[in-house]
Amino acid sequence: MTSLTFERHCDEIVSQTERLSAHVRGADLTAPVVACPGWNLGQLLRHVGGDHRWAEEIVRTRATGPVPDDLVNDLGAYTDEDAAVLVPWLTEGAEQLSAALRAAGPDALAWNPSADRPAPVAFWARRMTYETVVHRADAALAAGARFDLDGELAVEAVEEWLEYSTFPEAFEPRPDLPDLLGSGRTLHFDATDAGEWVVDLTGERPTWRTGADGAAATARGPVTDLLLYFYKRPAPGAQTKGDIALLDLWRARAGFWLEAPEA
């Protein structure tokens, strides 16, 4: 698995936020955000800045349980934002989060939603990096700007998604969805500029590995497009073949953590 350093993540939280701000410079902040129905561009930026402040509080206070996320989800009042106010606020939140992470160090313990007890805050450094990356893509699309992403970041973001796809919430039976696991169910993801991964759904729980194998379904394209495809964002470079229904089901189940309003 690709693992970038804690320091790199702390840097990227700030630099990705700066790039996001550049995408929206001069843009209409009331423009709708396609990937986040009901939000406009200003609300998207409020969400990202709220995410950063939420994570900063968790890290700074070494929270041992969930922290209220009103700044992340309560966006109804932010329908007509002023970029001159919003962009500096967004930058400030990213810098505060990065500083809190550095002050804590990667091994300090705090709550996170993926663990049943306080865990190293390195989780938050990585998670907020890719939270910012994906919403930067949303902002670029809404503003008519070009989105690109460093290959190392894209690979790690893909593997973060694959990691989440092995959590129980991503495969345990649900009455409202078909079963995910079963005989012959393997997926192949071919990043034409980075590498390949196989997801095996034939056992008692999903597993993934790097490499190539015969599969029931394949998604192929540049690694950034595969990342956007996973997140159900427009990904014109991603092509799929085989059991598309299985791919769609896997994406829906693997993205269980996106079902909450904050993502």
Kindly give the residue locations of the regions a language model identified.
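An N-terminal domain-cap segment
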Residues: M1-R46, A55-E57, Y78
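Short, helix-capping/interhelical loops that line the mouth of catalytic, cofactor-
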Residues: M1-E7, D51-A110, R146-V158, L162-E169
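Short, contiguous alpha-helical
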Residues: D28-D69, A115-E172, L226
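C-terminal interaction segments
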Residues: A212-A263
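Acidic/His-leaning functional-site neighborhoods
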Residues: F189-V223
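Acidic/histidine-rich alpha-helical segments that form the ligand environment
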Residues: Y78-L109, V121-E131, D138, L180-H188, ...
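A glycine-rich beta-turn/hairpin centered on an aromatic-Pro dipeptide
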Residues: W161-V198
